[in-house]
């Protein structure tokens, strides 16, 4: 679970919430 969160926040925008919420965008569409 945490590993997925880390990977998500590593490439996506992460909100400064507690717990942090990852807002992933389709970077492949850029």
From Swiss-Prot:
Q: Give the keywords, sorted.
A: Disulfide bond, Protease inhibitor, Serine protease inhibitor
Q: Which domain of life is it from?
A: Eukaryota
According to the record, the signal peptide region is: none
Question: Which cellular component appears as one GO term in the record?
Answer: extracellular region
Which SUPFAM superfamilies is this protein grouped with?
A: Bowman-Birk inhibitor, BBI
Site positions (Reactive bond for trypsin) are: 16-17
Looking up Pfam families in the UniProt record yields:
Bowman-Birk_leg
Q: Which InterPro entries match?
A: Bowman-Birk_prot_inh, Prot_inh_BBI
Q: Which GO terms describe its molecular function?
A: serine-type endopeptidase inhibitor activity
Spell out the disulfide connections. 9-24, 14-22
One GO BP annotation is: negative regulation of endopeptidase activity
**Similarity comment:** Belongs to the Bowman-Birk serine protease inhibitor family.
What function does the entry list? Answer: Inhibits trypsin (IC(50)=17.60 nM) and, to a lesser extent, alpha-chymotrypsin (IC(50)=2.38 uM).
List the protein's name. Answer: Bowman-Birk type proteinase inhibitor 4
Tell me what organism the protein belongs to. Answer: Lathyrus sativus (White vetchling)
